[in-house]
Amino acid sequence: WLMAAEVLASGIDFSFAPVLDLHTGLSQVIGNRAFAAEPERVSILASAFMSGMHDAGMATTGKHFPGHGNVAADSHTDIPVDTRTLAQIREQDLQPFARCVGLLDAVMPAHVIYERVDPACAGFSKYWLQTVLRGELGFDGVIFSDDLVMAGAAAAGGMEQRIDAALGAGCDMILVCNARDQALQALAHLENLQVSGNPRLQRMQRRQRWTPELLEQSEQWGRAKKLVEELTGEAS
């Protein structure tokens, strides 16, 4: 609740949260962004976190489907390859997504290749996005691509090929971050594709208006602030 309310009060509609990956100790880029190592604990903690986000009026985004925690490579700078079987992934990494699907407004897939399942990375894979996420898990919310500038997306080709692969696999919106030239290239390509508006994206709009003044007047914010101060030993 606290994160969501303060982000909304800053004028931002939503955060790409929470991380549903497992903290296996293998992935440094996931690391302590994950709630825990065990799927059940991740599911319980993430469910509470998302309920708080919803209470504050913010939509949720679970990432990185179907799980980034079991690869050492960083998808920002490399193309990670997960060598496990589908059965192993289902038993571990996929569990938080399956258990939390009712609280998820959006999902962000991983730029990871699960080579024994599909040769394409998850964000460009119809199998992962359509067969598993939409079909088996029954997810009907928004699918965001992860940042298409990342090295993990390079397996699909150049920026135009990455966009085509993401949209073709089932992404509702693509992300192109921290690279203005590639963002302009993406916009031009999308105009050529004549991509129309997607009604699913309306789910991501804020559901409650917060301002800094309203937040400071909120009893719930006051209680949360006091709790944080007690936990950290710091008064703001």
PLM segments and residue spans:
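C-terminal basic regulatory modules in eukaryotic proteins
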Residues: 220-224
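Active-site oxyanion-binding pockets that recognize sulfate/phosphate
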Residues: 32-39, 83
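Second-shell residues forming the walls of enzyme active-site clefts
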Residues: 47-199, 207-214, 219, 230
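Glycine-rich, aromatic-flanked loop segments that form ligand/cofactor-binding clefts
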Residues: 3-22, 42, 49-66
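Glycine-rich anion/phosphate-binding loops
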Residues: 1-6, 37-45, 87-90
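Surface-exposed, active-site-proximal loop segments in enzymatic domains
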Residues: 25-35, 74-77
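Charge-patterned, long linear interaction tracts outside catalytic cores
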Residues: 225-236
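Short secondary-structure boundary segments
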Residues: 1-9, 126-131
